[in-house]
Amino acid sequence: MEQRQYKSKRKSPDTLRDWRKHTVQSDILTLTLNPALDVLTSIDKVESTHKMRCDHAIEHPGGGGVNVARVLHRLGASCVAAYMAGGVTGERHHQWMLHEKVRCHLLPITHETRESFSVHENSSGQDFRFVLPGPEVSEAEVQACFEYVAQHLPKQFLVISGGIAPGVPIDFYARLTRLANQHGLPVVIDANGPALHAALQEGVFLFKPSLRELSQLVGHDLPDERSWISACHALIAQKKAQVIALSLGEQGAMVVSQDQCWRAEALKVDVQTTIGAGDSFVGGMVWALYKGHDLLHAFQYGMAASAAALLQKGTPLCQPFDVHRLLPSVVVHAL
């Protein structure tokens, strides 16, 4: 892998407090509570006990909402990425966002932003991902985050993606969803666990579960396609979501609404990595909806963006050229 270096032009850590003053408004706001500086490398074979000489490491700003914003920026959407970050690692993460010219707002925290370490095994094509715990955030920092979102609600979509940081209340995503709903703002959420469950009680526009997460939500096994559709319809009938984009991994994906249901097989591409495919899917769908496309075409864009991300090494995410090149290859079947 090619080594990339980027030196911050700002002093650390004092200027972290200054970034809070910069406010921008947009059509789309993404929120990431527990971002990570993604460090990636590769090796021929992963072995236990032995010292393994890796290739040069590369860095990218990571975190669910951060990655969605990076995709939206590349595709040309008016988007701001807001994220909690702190310490030297947080500054490096922020500087990478500025380097990519993504409109962003750092919500400063006291403790150090985490790193995420991934190793690509060349011999097998597998990715080994090591995720460190996030920093503890204070009640005041959580409240500052909520106030920022409340004061800078976007015009079209609020995208909440990724897990909550230690110290963040379980109902925080639910509070944000309730706030957005009060203003008629659609919420797109890609999360898991109790924080997701609480948000769904408020009713979101769209969320993207895996098959395992969907099974946990409905409380029973989902052995076949019919059961998947039934589970999605049950959640929609309970007004937990208007649209469910069900990720099926190598089997593709499914999109279900109250009166529509489609499935698409995964595109056959030369897979370099699976990292970032899910975030690219969300970014592709939201971008298409932002541009006024209907749900079917948004699904197609999501599938194309996800496949385009598989072509990249590390987490560069999808590139617009590949998204538009792959789009005609996406075949969607109505169910």
Which role does the model predict for each range below?
Residues 170-259:
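Conserved phosphate/ATP/ADP-binding segment of small-molecule kinases
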Residues 50, 74-156, 325-335:
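Conserved N-terminal subdomain of the carbohydrate kinase-like
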Residues 129-131, 155-163, 190, 208-213:
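Short beta-strands and strand-loop turn motifs
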Residues 135-138, 164-168, 195-197, 253, ...:
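Short, small-residue-enriched loops and turns at beta-alpha junctions
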